[in-house]
Amino acid sequence: MKEVSLRGISKTFGQLTVLDRIDLEIHSGEFLVLVGPSGCGKSTLLRMVAGLEPISGGDLVIGGERANELPPQKRNIAMVFQSYALFPHMTARENIGFGPRIRGEKAAETAAKVDHAASILNLHSYLDRYPRQLSGGQRQRVAMGRAIVREPSVFLFDEPLSNLDAQLRVQMRTEIKALHQRLKSTVIYVTHDQIEAMTMADRIVVMNQGKIQQIGAPLDLYDRPANKFVAGFIGSPSMSFIPGTVADGFFCTGEGKKIAVSAAAKGARAAEAGIRPENFVIAREGAGLTLVVEVIEPTGPETHIYGRIAGEPVRAVFRERIQLAPGEQVPVTAGSEHIHLFDKESGLPL
């Protein structure tokens, strides 16, 4: 296990800056997730740590050693890709043992490493099968086994679950987290799926347009987003945003409807109120905001409502079965502690 430090890391392609002075400390044994929309630079950053992409500026330090010019094989890292990158003409056993074999390790030592990895990943029944004979989840476990036998100081995962169906993704993210808890290794994991980030990470790094937006524990980001982008990106279903103004302890929409907000948000100014779907509650008649119902989705334990408030699309999740019809107008509100206020122009919290 080693610490990884990124100090002012930048990446440019000609005049295009794709990563802008990234500063980040990954602790030894930490499971750190880089999350953000496509094109935010997260995979490029991971490839720079791996040595697959040259660094344009700044310093990469692995285990106290500057690694900018260190070749990938000297960094003592292992990477699991989105595509499984398995040799089709080799069995699972041969794929897992390929690295030690080409490094000239003894056959008995290689076999022991393969057996150890297979035990961790529950792969013994599949070791003599070829990749074409394995399911997507089994192939990904073989790819993980190939990483484990390297006995690396740092594991890198580049969207490893993107090619799997929804059920397999849930299963595999549980297995990857269990693997980390067993090996206690340093993990840097890239995904665009914030559910993966929330359920797996010790800390999350939210990125957008080549910059870090916020770093923190999953629930810290959920409860205290640093800006409107983080608030809208973290959470599923995502936060709804309603434009209006803040004045004298109330948030007012353009329709004249208002709800109480925190006392710290006093002072008239244009703002947006962010409310998470599960924080909406039915208000008394004539109070709160008016939700115009468009679509109702009963799921059994919950009722999901898609509609509009002050003309803006919102989603509300109620923890009970309620009977509503499209076009119906429902008074809703939220506790002031659950209303996130953002400046209309900057997107920063008020």
Curated annotation (Swiss-Prot):
UniProtKB keywords: ATP-binding, Cell inner membrane, Cell membrane, Membrane, Nucleotide-binding, Translocase, Transport
Annotated compartments: Cell inner membrane
GO function term, MF aspect, one: ATP binding
Gene Ontology BP terms: carbohydrate transport
ABC transporter domain location: 4-234
Gene3D superfamilies: 2.40.50.100, Nucleic acid-binding proteins, P-loop containing nucleotide triphosphate hydrolases
Membrane topology term: Peripheral membrane protein
Main location: membrane
Superkingdom of the source species: Bacteria
Binding site for ATP: 36-43
UniProt keyword Cytoplasm present: no
Top-rank EC class of the record's enzyme: translocase
Enzyme Commission number, as recorded: 7.-.-.-
InterPro entries linked to this entry: AAA+_ATPase, ABC_transporter-like_ATP-bd, ABC_transporter-like_CS, ABC_transpr_MalK-like, ABC_transpr_MalK/UgpC-like, Mo/tungstate-bd_C_term_dom, NA-bd_OB-fold, P-loop_NTPase
GO CC field: ATP-binding cassette (ABC) transporter complex, substrate-binding subunit-containing
One Pfam family hit: TOBE_2
Function field: Probably part of an ABC transporter complex. Probably responsible for energy coupling to the transport system.
Family label: Belongs to the ABC transporter superfamily.
Quaternary structure note: The complex is composed of two ATP-binding proteins (BRA0745), two transmembrane proteins (BRA0749) and a solute-binding protein (BRA0748).
Descriptive protein name: Putative ATP-binding protein BRA0745/BS1330_II0738
